[in-house]
Structures are given as C-alpha cells and as structure tokens.
Amino acid sequence: MPKKTVSVTTSITDQNYEVSLKTRNFTLKIDQPKPSGNDTAPTPLEFFLFALGACTCTIGKTIAEQRKIALKSIDVRIDGEINTDFLLGKTTDDRAGFYEINVYTKIDAPLTDEEKQELLKEIDKRCPLSDNIQEISKVNFVLE
C-alpha cells in the first residue's frame, strides 16, 4: 500500500491572531474576525470547511475522469454549527467541534439524479477529509 506523508507548518506571534501557514512553496494566512483578530483572512474553521469542499470537488473530478464522465462542474456549499462558548473557554458542558457538517453538492454532468447520487457516495467514500471527519483518526500532540 503506497503511503504519502503530507506536512504543513503554522505559527503565530504575540502581535495578533494572524497565523502563518506554510506547505511546499506556498504561504497562506488565517485570521480571526474583529475584535480578536484583524479579519484579514478566513478562520481555521472556515479553512477546515474549505478543505472539505475542495476535496469533494477534486475527488469528484478524479472519479469523473476515471469513468469518462463529461463533467462540467461541481459546486459545493458547506455549513456547520459550533458552540463558540466552548472553544472560548466560557463553558465545559459541550464539545469543541461541529455538531454536524452539511455538504450541499451540485453536479453538472450528463447523469441522472440517481447516477449523481451514486457519484456523490463515491466522492464521500474516497475523500480523505471526509474519512478523517467520519472515522476517528488518532491525533498526537507532541511538545517539541
């Protein structure tokens, strides 16, 4: 079974809530809305949902190419509800993560609704991010 390690680095300073993100030859940033942050970039939660949407799109395109489907587009809208009081430390009576994540997907391709539903099931099955959300992956926090 071929395996690939994917690595990223992130850092924050005492100056603000902007987080610098680096991977390969890319540098991005994350921020928080005002008043905590400067509202100059998406939040970590938004990036998380962006990543799931992007994975849905790219896995869908890969499957379409493999099956020779004349895919015109895949459009994804995602939302999730979260208790911000928990992550801000105002309560301990809940959990930090999203309660539920809804992935609304439009597939523009010459397929029946049933075929589109089957394609969406295959996308969900093959998307690594969906897998990591639905199946618990061990996360190790290691102090360096």
Predicted regions located by residue number:
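Extended beta-strand/beta-hairpin segments
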Residues: 1-50, 62-144
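Alpha-helical metal-binding/catalytic segments enriched in His/Glu/Asp
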Residues: 52-56
